[in-house]
Design a protein with these regions (language model features):
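Central I-helix of cytochrome P450 enzymes
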Residues: 207, 211, 216, 271, ...
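N-terminal membrane-proximal hinge/A-helix region immediately C-terminal to the signal-anchor transmembrane segment
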Residues: 2-8, 16-153, 174-185, 271-274, ...
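Cytochrome P450
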Residues: 2-44, 96-106, 166-177, 187-213, ...
């Protein structure tokens, strides 16, 4: 028979064990609940993502929106990703970033929408505070980021200068000097030594020297023999690259990094210090030169900086050094990158389409033959302005390159009042709008089923070049902000391209990687390594 005391002891032990187990279960209950919540949340997010993917062609995640898709695109080719989404969504889609960021916008490639925002409702779609704040450190209040009266004032003065006889003469003279005294000797040296050369780098140096002559009235010498490293040119490129990173970084984060002087913001600050030092030194020197010219009664300069120095603001006061700096930096950005980058893609496309190159060379030779005079021994052939104008097929080939690879692949606006696009997209006040020029060149609805093919003939009517609507072909923008330097850019590209193609066949190095770089303008990420052979 069991002892009662033993029974009590056993009962007590069992009770203690049960209580202990109960308390242990209670302790792990919160962990189990947390696990259940996490599992349920994960299932919800997965189902939500699948539904959104089927519905919109792009996953929209709770809290973080479409950020994962954007990050994947940034690792590969963001421009092709945008094009794919636009094609799937009929030409317009709303990008939803994380709820706590500024990465919310409407992206469009519909020509009707572009005409609406660039012309019809121009005043309702300024660059806006978001764009201005993002590029302020680099571009200041220059023409690319300015709105309203500040923009109109610069636009009017620059327009008068661009159409003046003095400026046109300066552009033609400086281009002849740079192409024949620097560009061609650099290429000939590479040919003689059979050395591959980065043509994009060479062209960037050409246009940088050219635009600095026009904007500042100085020659930085980037294209001199040996291709020297020019601190200002290097700093300018660093600053533009660092600025573009802000557009894919939440505003609060890049501003915090700027305050702490860390990461990309430190790089931007250091490069801008060199840019500003160069610009302000040039401005100070020019002021002294103009004082001497006024004292002697001479007036020989026609560069952009000098023109604005002689103007007065609304209070009849000279413009500030900061204002002058902003103007020149903006025009250098426009003049340096756009033409050179376009030419780099143009030569790459010719390498892939030799039949187009043959037609261009035939056109150039025919125009030279029309001179009716033989070249003198040792005299270098220099194309005349009227001959460059006759190069219609070359202009078509350059336009086709710009259609597929626009120098500015995307641009930005911000709506200041509630609007509705012609395609029915509703825009609330403050909405950021991205118009994708790169994608427009790859839309069957705009250019037909052969939109991805390189066909200069689509620009010709009975052998004559015919331009397209600025809202279909937006490489030079449209409406009141149509590029002031469009005619100069075409002349510069045609003169440089014809001077090269008349003398050399340009071959891209085998297996050279080609990809666009994420930047304000459409650089080739790895440059364009080429070799040159003399034409017969």
């Amino acid at each position: 028979m069991q002892n009662p005391s033993n029974m009590n002891s056993t009962t007590t032990t069992s009770t203690s064990t049960m209580l202990s187990s109960g308390f242990s279960f209670l302790r792990i209950m919160p962990e189990l609940q947390t696990l259940e919540i996490l599992l349920a949340t994960s299932i919800f997010i997965a189902i939500h993502s699948i539904r959104q993917s089927k519905k919109q062609g792009l996953a929209v995640w709770p809290f973080i929106g479409m950020l994962p898709s954007l990050l994947l695109a940034l690792r590969h080719d963001m421009y092709e990703w945008i094009t794919k989404v636009l094609n799937e969504r009929g030409g317009t889609f709303a990008f939803k970033g994380p709820w706590f960021t500024n990465l919310q916008c409407v992206v469009t490639s519909d020509p009707r929408n572009l005409e609406h925002l660039l012309k019809t409702k121009f005043t309702s779609f300024p660059k806006g505070p978001y764009f201005r704040n993002t590029v302020q450190d680099l571009l200041g209040d220059g023409i690319f980021s300015a709105d309203d009266e500040t923009w109109r004032k610069q636009r009017k003065a620059a327009s008068l200068e661009f159409h003046s006889a003095e400026f046109r003469s300066l552009t033609a003279r400086s281009l002849v000097e740079l192409v024949h005294s620097r560009l061609l000797p650099v290429l000939e040296s590479a040919r003689q030594t059979n050395t591959p050369v980065d043509l994009q780098d060479v062209l960037l140096r050409l246009t940088f020297d050219n635009v600095c002559m026009l904007a500042f009235g100085i020659d930085p010498g980037c294209l001199r023999p040996g291709l020297p490293d020019i601190p200002f040119a290097h700093a300018f490129e660093e600053a533009t690259e660092a600025t573009i990173i802000r557009f894919v970084t939440p505003t609060a984060i890049w501003k915090a990094l700027r305050f702490a002087d860390l990461s990309n913001e430190r790089r931007l600050r250091r490069s801008l210090r060199q840019v500003d030092e160069f610009a302000y030194n040039v401005i100070d020197t020019r002021k002294k030169e103009l004082q001497l010219e006024e004292a002697s009664g001479t007036n020989t300069r026609s560069d952009l900086l000098t023109v604005f120095m002689r103007l007065r603001d609304e209070n009849d006061q000279p413009y500030s050094d900061k204002f002058l700096r902003d103007i020149c930096v903006n025009f250098i950005l426009a003049g340096r990158d756009t033409s050179s980058v376009a030419l780099a893609w143009f030569f790459w496309l010719l390498n892939k389409n030799p039949e187009v190159e043959a037609k261009i060379v035939d056109e150039i030779r025919r125009i030279v033959k029309e001179r009716g005079e033989s070249e003198k021994e040792g005299e270098e052939l220099i194309f005349r302005p009227e001959e460059v104008k006759k190069m219609e097929y070359l202009q078509a080939a350059l336009s086709e390159a710009l259609r597929l690879y626009p120098s500015v692949p995307v641009d930005h606006k911000e709506v200041v009042e509630d609007e509705v696009f012609p395609d029915g997209t509703v825009l609330k006040k403050g909405t950021k709008v991205i118009y994708a020029m790169y994608s427009m060149g790859r839309m069957e609805s705009i250019w037909g089923k052969d939109c991805r093919e390189y066909k200069p003939e689509r620009w010709l009517r009975d052998g004559r070049f015919m331009s397209e609507s600025a809202y279909k072909f937006t490489a030079f923008n449209g409406g009141p902000r149509l590029c002031l330097g469009k005619d100069f850019a075409y002349y510069q590209m045609k003169f440089a391209a014809s001077s090269i193609l008349y003398r050399y066949h340009v071959k891209v190095v085998d297996k050279h990687p080609i990809a666009p770089k994420l930047a304000l303008t459409m650089y080739m990420k790895y440059g364009l390594k080429v070799t040159l052979t003399k034409r017969d």
